[in-house]
């Protein structure tokens, strides 16, 4: 089991390192024990968190309400749960 991504029942749990204010949204790969994701949103007033949940919902083909930030609301290091994903992105599948 990789410490960055694991299955918990039907859910996928991700330990993330977020790079805000990037030129485009992208999964960059492993960053230590975390999956590094670049997002275009700035880390201001929860915009990055909102953008991240919407983006993960799109990538995993679930409603953004099914993406929960479990740890790290205020920092770059986050633990996120995607409830019953309909699809798992190839970059995530490769390290599962």
Swiss-Prot record:
One of its GO terms (cellular component) is cytoplasm. This is UPF0235 protein VV2877. It comes from the Bacteria. The lineage of its organism: Bacteria, Pseudomonadati, Pseudomonadota, Gammaproteobacteria, Vibrionales. PANTHER family: UPF0235 PROTEIN C15ORF40. It holds the Pfam family DUF167. Belongs to the UPF0235 family. NCBIfam families: DUF167 family protein (TIGR00251), PRK05090.1 (NF003466).
């Amino acid at each position: 089991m990789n410490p960055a991504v694991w299955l918990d029942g039907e859910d996928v749990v991700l330990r993330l390192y977020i790079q805000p204010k990037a030129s485009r949204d992208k999964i960059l790969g492993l960053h230590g024990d975390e999956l590094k994701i670049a997002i275009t949103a700035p880390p201001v007033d929860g915009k990055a968190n909102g953008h991240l949940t919407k983006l993960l919902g799109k990538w995993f083909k679930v409603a953004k309400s099914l993406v929960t930030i479990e740890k790290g609301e205020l920092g770059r290091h986050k633990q996120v749960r995607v409830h019953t994903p309909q699809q798992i992105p190839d970059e995530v599948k490769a390290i599962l």
